[in-house]
């Protein structure tokens, strides 16, 4: 039985001398070495381009293979399958698919700035469509490829054996222009990657010429010539900082944006037309992403997307809805789709066989050094060829000059060998060819002091092969002229070889020719002003009326849409209701204001007014759940427009009130960062709900009003209502409620230090003055108004003129509106300040006539307008100054004539509006307003 612990080993492989050929090695060492070999193979032989010609091995082999097979620009197209086979069989044994994919990319005008292959057939599209099979497509080298391959047969670059040593292939192509910059590169190696953008060929050549003229040229000077990448698909490049970083260090990131315009399409609608898309963006995928965002309602305002692209170029039309803001929709498309991309630049290339991160100056200087070496090697090759030709011409010239003697020697020789030897052993006069012999300088023809030379074997063979027609006088002149041309050419080549300056001149001349051939206008615009714009900067500022319905629909409507009417009118439609949906909340805000939304469940959300959907007065709006995620079944019961100037937020507090009479005060900064999904604003007891939120400062007065006509006023200070540190507290009791009652309004009032007697005296004086002005004064009013100038005494309380002026300046008025459309204005001095948690005092005298319930109570200022909205969706705008000022315990006057079973659901002030008198002639008015603008039924 074998030992499982030590199994028998395999017999060792022995060398002829009896020693073992097996070398023990650890697994770690072998894996490390093998992986390193693999990594270097991928880096050097597959993924990274060479900095000299800008090509990866597969691209280089395709171009060289097509050149060797004669598939040049001046020849007919050849089947791609044949090209595939030639390249795979001779140079690149890695599968036909890999070769064909690389060939296709070289032919795509949307992939390369200067395509190197001229393709015929379906070579793919910007929609990501694959190319047709290689048996269907044809190709040949493009004219631009010749500038990479020219002089490859003149010993300009080194060659190496192919994979099976059956062919020789170039290590690099003798590129005549910096193809690495012109066509860029993409590749992922092991542990590294390259991503080099394309550039404008004219600019790249100009930059190369600038560096030739001034090798110490700065990057800033270069960037005036080559300002940045130039993509074949065009587009806009935003800013230059990323470009400079990439040009300086080899790494950087640029923002590329599609080129778009606004057009008017059918029906007078606006459309966004895309004419250029960012580089390497799949157009079909881009449109699919847009459609997904529209279906998910992440982008609003798009009605249709269609692709009208054709051979003339890209054209994608995005039709917008009538209520959409084109700039905002476009900004959302930039933000959420590949209409705008961040293109990361990593200019990694092989320099001397080693990966190197290269900046713009590095790439250009590397190319210039390489190109100078190509020119030098070409000159040496051509010099050798010219000298060989000159060497032969010397022999022919000597033979022609001594033709009789040459013929005699040949005729006397028994055979060609003897004739050749006879020619080589004779001294020939060479005074006429002495200058050329000096240029040849090959040691074959040694000029003696007697100005004679002996012919070499090559020259002797050339003479023997000379045709008789070359012996004519004309042919002798041709030989002489050619000798002069070759001599001049040898002189030029010697100058090129011996002078760096001359080589730079040659390079400059050749680049000028290529520049004229590849001249192309810039396609990608570099825009310094189009930085990332936020949506808000695109929105025109203005006042909006925001309306929220019970079923959770919201809209914003420009304030000037609602024309002002006298109180007592019938109003106009504020929203088109469906079913039994009613308006539950409306408020006035600026488009650029932050608005805090508070749900009945105590959650807070934040949104800018301009982000709310805009709609006309009769439109219903859109569902709030599309704007406020995770709202659930809770309704929005409180909204709070915050000051537009965020510096005013300092020192502001938020006061929360619940239907059960609870209240809490927090710092506004606790709600400065509200996440998209909302956050807990107030912890509520079961069955309770949030009814209002307001901003206040330390020392302000808080007033709660109940549905059954009660109210309470107390001061917001540390003694009465402290600032809570947390958001999840349920707060403290603000008002004690009777059975069946609930808090319906929260107001913040200015705190004024005044005794009860001073408040009562001032109220009596102010009432008397108003009655006197209206011609309604009685005897008591007259007595009050006849007081001397030093002070006013009312009910034994003396008020100085200064005190009256101070109280008048600080006076606020509270408007209370019932569900039946009745309302009144009362001075805030009529509401005494008490402690928190009491039952409060009467706010209004309720009766069946005025509705038995309060809709709202809030402060108004002179000049304010007030809007009342009913559950039927009707709205009226009334100047607050037309509502008579009465005492606290009165029934009010008619503000809004409501129909039977119609109730007022929302009342809010409209500030700083222009008065537009509407006498009831508007088509949207249901009934005319009172002609004199006064109360139609006095219920005081």
Swiss-Prot record:
GO molecular function: ATP binding; DNA binding; DNA negative supercoiling activity
Catalytic activity entry: ATP-dependent breakage, passage and rejoining of double-stranded DNA
EC number assigned by the record: 5.6.2.2
Purpose: A type II topoisomerase that negatively supercoils closed circular double-stranded (ds) DNA in an ATP-dependent manner to modulate DNA topology and maintain chromosomes in an underwound state. Negative supercoiling favors strand separation, and DNA replication, transcription, recombination and repair, all of which involve strand separation. Also able to catalyze the interconversion of other topological isomers of dsDNA rings, including catenanes and knotted rings. Type II topoisomerases break and join 2 DNA strands simultaneously in an ATP-dependent manner.
Source organism of the structure: Granulibacter bethesdensis (strain ATCC BAA-1260 / CGDNIH1)
Name of this chain's protein: DNA gyrase subunit A
UniProt similarity note: Belongs to the type II topoisomerase GyrA/ParC subunit family.
UniProt main location, coarse: cytoplasm
Additional comment: Few gyrases are as efficient as E.coli at forming negative supercoils. Not all organisms have 2 type II topoisomerases; in organisms with a single type II topoisomerase this enzyme also has to decatenate newly replicated chromosomes.
The organism's place on the tree of life at top rank: Bacteria
Keywords for the protein's UniProt record, in alphabetical order: ATP-binding, Cytoplasm, DNA-binding, Isomerase, Nucleotide-binding, Topoisomerase
């Amino acid at each position: 039985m074998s030992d499982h612990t030590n199994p028998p080993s395999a017999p060792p492989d022995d060398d002829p001398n009896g020693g073992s050929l097996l070398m023990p090695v650890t697994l770690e060492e072998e894996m490390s070495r093998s992986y390193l070999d693999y990594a270097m193979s991928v880096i050097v032989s597959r993924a990274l381009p060479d900095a000299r010609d800008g090509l990866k091995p597969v691209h280089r082999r395709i171009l060289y293979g097509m050149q060797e097979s004669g598939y040049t620009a001046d020849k007919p197209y050849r089947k791609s399958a044949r090209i595939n086979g030639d390249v795979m069989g001779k140079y690149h044994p890695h599968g036909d698919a890999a070769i064909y994919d690389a060939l296709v990319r070289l032919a795509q005008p949307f992939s390369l700035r200067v395509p190197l292959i001229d393709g015929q057939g379906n070579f793919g599209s910007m929609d990501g469509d694959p190319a047709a099979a290689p048996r269907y497509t044809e190709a040949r080298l493009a004219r631009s490829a010749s500038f990479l391959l020219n002089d490859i047969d003149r010993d300009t670059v080194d060659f190496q054996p192919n994979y099976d040593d059956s062919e020789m292939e170039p290590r690099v192509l003798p590129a005549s222009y910096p193809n690495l910059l012109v066509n860029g590169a993409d590749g992922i190696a092991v542990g590294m990657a390259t991503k080099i953008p394309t550039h404008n060929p004219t600019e790249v050549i100009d930059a190369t010429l600038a560096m030739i003229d001034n090798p110490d040229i700065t990057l800033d000077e270069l960037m005036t010539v080559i300002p940045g990448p130039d993509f074949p698909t065009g587009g806009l490049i935003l800013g230059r900082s990323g470009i400079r970083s990439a040009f300086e260090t080899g790494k950087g990131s640029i923002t590329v944006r599609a080129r778009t315009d606004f057009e008017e399409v059918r029906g007078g609608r606006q459309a966004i037309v895309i004419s250029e898309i960012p580089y390497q963006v799949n157009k079909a995928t881009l449109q699919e992403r847009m459609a997904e965002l529209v279906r998910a309602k992440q982008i609003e305002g798009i009605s249709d997307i269609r692709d009208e692209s054709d051979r003339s170029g890209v054209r994608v039309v995005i039709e917008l809805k009538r209520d959409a803001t084109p700039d905002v929709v476009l900004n959302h498309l930039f933000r959420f789709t590949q209409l705008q991309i961040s293109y990361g630049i990593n200019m990694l290339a092989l320099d001397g066989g080693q990966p190197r991160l290269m900046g713009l100056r590095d790439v250009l200087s590397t190319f210039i050094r390489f190109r100078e070496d190509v020119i030098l090697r070409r000159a040496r090759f051509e010099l050798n060829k010219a000298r060989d030709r000159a060497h032969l011409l010397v022999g022919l010239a000597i033979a022609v000059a001594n033709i009789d003697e040459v013929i005699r020697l040949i005729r006397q020789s028994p055979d060609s060998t003897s004739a050749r030897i006879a020619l080589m052993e004779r001294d020939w006069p060479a005074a006429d060819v002495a200058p050329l012999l000096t240029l040849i300088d090959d040691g074959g023809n040694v000029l003696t002091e007697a100005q004679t030379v002996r012919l070499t074997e090559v020259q002797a063979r050339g003479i023997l092969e000379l045709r008789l027609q070359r012996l004519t006088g004309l042919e002798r002149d041709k030989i002489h002229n050619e000798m002069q041309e070759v001599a001049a050419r040898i002189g030029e080549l010697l100058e090129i070889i011996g002078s760096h300056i001359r080589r730079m001149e040659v390079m400059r001349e050749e680049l000028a020719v290529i520049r004229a051939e590849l001249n192309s206008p810039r396609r990608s615009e570099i825009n310094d002003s189009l930085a990332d714009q936020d949506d808000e900067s695109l929105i025109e500022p203005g006042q909006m009326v925001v309306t929220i319905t019970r079923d959770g629909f919201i809209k914003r409507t420009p304030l000037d849409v609602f024309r002002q009417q006298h109180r007592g009118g019938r109003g106009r439609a504020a929203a088109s209701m469906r079913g039994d949906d009613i308006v539950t909340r409306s408020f006035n805000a600026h488009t650029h204001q932050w608005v805090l939304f508070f749900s009945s469940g105590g959650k807070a959300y934040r949104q800018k007014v301009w982000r709310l959907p805009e709609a006309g007065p009769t439109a219903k709006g859109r569902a709030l759940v599309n704007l406020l995620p995770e709202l659930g079944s809770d309704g929005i019961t409180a909204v709070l427009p915050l000051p537009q100037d965020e510096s005013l937020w300092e020192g502001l507090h938020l006061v929360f009130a619940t239907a059960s009479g609870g209240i809490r005060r927090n710092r506004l900064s606790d709600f400065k960062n509200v996440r998209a999904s909302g956050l807990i604003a107030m912890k509520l007891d079961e069955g309770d709900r949030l009814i209002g939120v307001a901003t206040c400062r330390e020392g302000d007065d808080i007033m709660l009003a109940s549905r059954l006509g009660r109210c309470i006023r107390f001061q917001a200070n540390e003694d009465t209502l402290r600032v809570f540190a947390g958001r999840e507290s349920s707060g403290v009791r603000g008002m004690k409620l009777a059975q069946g009652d609930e808090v319906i309004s929260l107001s913040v009032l200015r705190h004024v230090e005044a005794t009860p007697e001073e408040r009562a005296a001032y109220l009596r004086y102010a009432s008397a003055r108003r009655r006197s002005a209206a011609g309604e004064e009685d005897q008591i009013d007259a007595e009050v108004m006849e007081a001397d100038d030093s002070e006013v005494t009312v009910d034994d309380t003396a008020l100085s003129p200064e005190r009256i002026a101070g109280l008048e300046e600080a006076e606020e008025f509270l408007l209370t509106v019932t569900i039946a459309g009745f309302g009144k204005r009362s001075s805030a001095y009529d509401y005494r300040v008490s402690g928190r948690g009491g039952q409060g005092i009467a706010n209004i005298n309720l009766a069946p006539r005025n509705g038995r319930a309060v809709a709202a109570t809030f402060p108004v200022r002179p000049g304010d307008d007030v809007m009342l909205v009913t559950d039927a969706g009707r709205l009226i705008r009334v100047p607050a100054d037309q509502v008579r000022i009465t005492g606290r315990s009165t029934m009010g006057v008619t503000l809004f004539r409501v129909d039977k079973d119609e109730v007022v659901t929302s009342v809010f002030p409209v500030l700083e509006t222009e008065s537009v008198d509407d006498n009831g002639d508007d088509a949207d008015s249901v009934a005319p307003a009172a002609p004199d603008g006064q109360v139609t039924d006095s219920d005081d």
